Amino acid sequence: MAIANKNIIFVAGLGGIGFDTSREIVKKGPKNLVILDRIENPAAIAELKALNPKVTVTFYLYDVTVSVAESTKLLQKIFDQLKTVDLLINGAGILDDHQIERTIAVNFTGTVNTITAIMSFWDKRKGGPGGVIANVCSVTGFNAIYQVPVYSASKAAALSFTNSLAKLAPITGVTAYSINPGITKTPLLHKFNSWLDVEPRVGELLLEHPTQTSLECAQNFVKAIEANQNGAIWKVDLGTLEAIEWTKHWDSHI
């Protein structure tokens, strides 16, 4: 997918990886970049607008833990304004295994609800034009960081959901792929808790291993967007982009 002249919605586009990715997207010249985030950051929005004045950058307050109905109301405003949306990026995520319910609500349920809401506008069975979904999951969806099992499980769930969406594309007209960052230097990595405090130093321990910068991650994120491969499971790690082959151990045969 060429990003130029596209209409893009980016949920959590002002976070660590999210903001660097928003910068890289704006450089590519979309027609509209609509950022949905739960915290206002006028300086960040102003920076994006200045980076490429030809791009219309719009911000709406959005908490992914709201209901499908509330998400649909906001999306209706956006579709009324833009008429069409080409790409939805779901980037919301928290890493704090002390907050079990919120971790699941943000990392998994929120993604499901946002996508369920946008299907009202995209689903070809309802006369929609289809669309593309990029879900930010995690390499912990491949193999858990066992000291943060709630986070890891929530990301595995998001990955599984994304894989299913891709297989449903012939029915819905909506394609999907996942972006799975490895250990990336962001504020998220420094401010989290392990489940039941099983490893108080888990953040420090992770940073003792090779990492990538959020800019490196963002640049490869944009390459994945441009590749636009339905069903792709992208590993974005150590400054590289790699499509993962998923191993099938069981088949429903339906």
Swiss-Prot record:
This is Alcohol dehydrogenase 1. The keyword Translocase does not apply. InterPro entries: ADH_Drosophila-type, NAD(P)-bd_dom_sf, Sc_DH/Rdtase_CS, SDR_fam. Homodimer. PANTHER family: 15-HYDROXYPROSTAGLANDIN DEHYDROGENASE [NAD(+)] (PTHR44229), ALCOHOL DEHYDROGENASE-RELATED (PTHR44229:SF8). The active site is at Y151. Changing P187T: In strain: VRF. It catalyses: a primary alcohol + NAD(+) = an aldehyde + NADH + H(+); a secondary alcohol + NAD(+) = a ketone + NADH + H(+). Coiled coil: none annotated. SUPFAM superfamilies: NAD(P)-binding Rossmann-fold domains. Keywords: NAD, Oxidoreductase. One of its GO terms (cellular component) is cytoplasm. Pfam families: adh_short. It is an enzyme of class 1 (oxidoreductase). Substrate binds at S138. NAD(+) binds at residues 10-33.
